[in-house]
Structures are given as structure tokens and as C-alpha cells.
Regions:
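Extended hydrophobic secondary-structure segments
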Residues: 213-221
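Short, charged, intrinsically disordered terminal tails
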Residues: 263-295
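Acidic/glycine-rich phosphate/pyrophosphate-binding loops and surrounding catalytic core
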Residues: 1-209, 213, 225-230, 235-238, ...
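Short secondary-structure boundary segments
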Residues: 218, 241, 263-264
Length: 296
């Protein structure tokens, strides 16, 4: 998965509307001639870089003439003091973009960093770590991109990607078989079917329906192992529910194919990132004397 400016522009514009509103009532009054200044965005914490394109687009939206040099790429390691972006832009630009640009990098790097920890924990197994749909509504695409930068894979992007039969679908349909039969009669032939199973009996029923993916939902290790014996290679075996950094290793070592982890996106600690303006030009500062002279 890759991001491009066309995809991210609506997110950037909304963030700037939230941040600037009708105008910057602090920086706008302090800046004088508004000369070009230099600045750096750099890491104060350690982790995996993500969100640089959003920071870049944030700056260019406010100042189309800005010059930005990327010192690292999304998905690379960073540590304290590492410079991520070098920027040349009008002095007023930095007041307006600082919070948004930093927030994009901090939050997305937080997801990528946590994801990398999970991936490293189970790299001795064949399991594929994926995200879920849990997270901030409206930002799913960005969160899933950050997961990829951290080295994991994406689960479905939306309910239109596959047939995912969950507990409430089963209740409404009166059982797995009826749900699958109804959905097979209506869904595109290209769709895979995944069924969320809470018991071994549900696993067997789903297998009898010929579904392509079995999700072991909140099962303990013994249940997962028993479920894998039932599956026996006839479907992709996915474990999900309550997975954390303490439990993922024993789950992976059962031999499941996929572990979906809501924790990648629903509980994130951001990475500390900062912006530092360099060599402030005297003409950038509007003194009270200059203001009085300008206003008569």
C-alpha cells in the first residue's frame, strides 16, 4: 500500500481547517516581512518513521513555494536527534503547520513502531500479523498505511472487501449455514468467505460450508490447537481477540496462519517529534515600534 498526494489531501485540508480556523491570531500578528526561514523536523524519541508525506503536504498546502528535503523514508528507524525533514518556508508558515505536521508524524510513527514490535516478536514463526478495523473513524486508510510501514499486513479495508460473517450475522440468520448459503447466493463469485467462530462446533460448521477463512475468536491456546486439527489445511486459520504483546508469541507458535491485532491501531502511544526554526532573521520579527510606524 502506498499513499499519494491526491489520496491524502482531504485529510490535510481538514486538519488545517481545524488548526487555523479563520486565521492565526498569534503568529499572524508577530511576523513582520515574512522572509524565508529554515527549520528542521526531528525525532526526540525512538521508533519507526511514518507520516512524512502528510507533513510534507501540510507544509506545501500553506506555502506552495516551500522547499522540503526528506532525510529519511517512511518505514526506516529513527532515534533521538535524527533529522526527518529540512524545510525552507516563510516564517508565518511554521506557526500554522507545526502542530498538524508533527501530529501526523507522531501518531503514524506510533502505530508503525508498535507494529514493528509485534512483528519482531513472532518473526521466528510463519504467522502473518494484520490489523483490524478498530481505530479512529475516518482515518482508517492512514492507520493501515502506518501498519504496513511497521512491517505487518492489512486485514480488510471496508465491509466491501470480503464476506465477513460475525456473531450478530449468525444470530440474525439463525446459524452459520443459513448465513453462508444466503450470502453465497448474493455475493460476487470473487469474494472469499470468513466466519468468526467462538467454539469448535462453529469451526466445524463453517468448514462444512466450505468457507475460505476460519477466525478463532477469543479462543484459548488449547481451543486454537484443537481448531487447527479440525481445519487441517482446508482453510486459512486466523486468531483474533484480546491479542497483546504478551500473548501473541504463544498464539503464533500454535501454527495459525494469521493473527489480527486490534491493539496496533486502537491504543497507540505517539513518538515524540519536534520542529526547530533555525537562524531567525531580524526582519521576521514585528517589533512594537515597527507596528506603530506601520499604522501611523
Amino acid at each position: 500500500m502506498q499513499l499519494n498526494r491526491f489520496m491524502i489531501r482531504p485529510y490535510v485540508e481538514q486538519a488545517l481547517r481545524d488548526e487555523i480556523g479563520p486565521g492565526d491570531t498569534t503568529g499572524g500578528f508577530l511576523v513582520g516581512e515574512d522572509p524565508v526561514q529554515t527549520a528542521q523536523i526531528y525525532a526526540k524519541g525512538s521508533g519507526i518513521v511514518c507520516g512524512l508525506l502528510l507533513a510534507d503536504e501540510t507544509i506545501r498546502t500553506v506555502d506552495p513555494d516551500a522547499r522540503i528535503e526528506h532525510m529519511v523514508k517512511d518505514g526506516e528507524d529513527m532515534g533521538p536527534g535524527k533529522v526527518l525533514l529540512k524545510i525552507e518556508a516563510k516564517a508565518s508558515t511554521f506557526f500554522m503547520i507545526e502542530r498538524c505536521a508533527l501530529d501526523w508524524i507522531q501518531q503514524m510513527s506510533g502505530i508503525a513502531t508498535k507494529t514493528r514490535r509485534y512483528v519482531n516478536l513472532v518473526k521466528h514463526t510463519k504467522v502473518r500479523v494484520t490489523d483490524t478495523r478498530k481505530g479512529w473513524p475516518g482515518l482508517r486508510m492512514l492507520q493501515k498505511y502506518a501498519v504496513r510501514c511497521g512491517g505487518a499486513h492489512n486485514h480488510i479495508f471496508s465491509l466491501s472487501n470480503c464476506v465477513l460473517v460475525k456473531d450478530n450475522h449468525i444470530k440474525i440468520a439463525g446459524g452459520i449455514r443459513n448465513a453462508v448459503e444466503i450470502l453465497r447466493s448474493r455475493a460476487q463469485h470473487t469474494f472469499k468467505f470468513e466466519v468468526e467462530c467462538e467454539t469448535l462446533e462453529m469451526v466445524q460448521e463453517a468448514l462444512d460450508c466450505g468457507v475460505e477463512v476460519i477466525m478463532f475468536d477469543n479462543m484459548d491456546l488449547d481451543e486454537i490447537k484443537a481448531g487447527l486439527k479440525l481445519v487441517n489445511g482446508r482453510a486459512i486459520a486466523e486468531a483474533s481477540g484480546g491479542v497483546n504483546e504478551r500473548t501473541i508469541v504463544p498464539i503464533a507458535e500454535t501454527g495459525v496462519d494469521v493473527i489480527s491485532v486490534g491493539d496496533l491501531t486502537h491504543s497507540v502511544t505517539s513518538v515524540d517529534i519536534s520542529l526547530d526554526v533555525k537562524d531567525i532573521k531580524p526582519s521576521a520579527i514585528r517589533t512594537i515600534e515597527r507596528l506603530r510606524a506601520a499604522t501611523g
